[in-house]
Amino acid sequence: MHTTLFFSNRTQAVRLPKSISFPEDVKHVEIIAVGRSRIITPVGESWDSWFDGEGASTDFMSTREQPAVQEREGF
């Protein structure tokens, strides 16, 4: 989905199409900058959907090469 950026009172804004707008009860959002990208989430919910989701698939990292457990001196 594409949308436009515009300026409102010298502040850059993004216009969200109705089909992807936030629910009406969302009044505040967090914006996380990742390089040239921006992630917009309701305040306090940035990780909630990930933890509430299905999680990783059963084969996630099934072929991961893990080093042997190291013997370490205790504290």
Curated annotation (Swiss-Prot):
InterPro entries: Anti_VapB2-like, SpoVT-AbrB_dom, SpoVT-AbrB_sf, VapB_TA_antitoxins. Keywords: DNA-binding, Toxin-antitoxin system. Antitoxin component of a type II toxin-antitoxin (TA) system. Upon expression in E.coli neutralizes the effect of cognate toxin VapC. The keyword Lipid biosynthesis does not apply. It comes from the Bacteria. SUPFAM superfamilies: AbrB/MazE/MraZ-like (SSF89447). The gene is vapB. Belongs to the VapB family. This is Antitoxin VapB. Induction: Induced by amino acid starvation and by chloramphenicol treatment. GO terms for molecular function: DNA binding. Residues 3-45 form the SpoVT-AbrB domain. Forms a complex with toxin VapC.
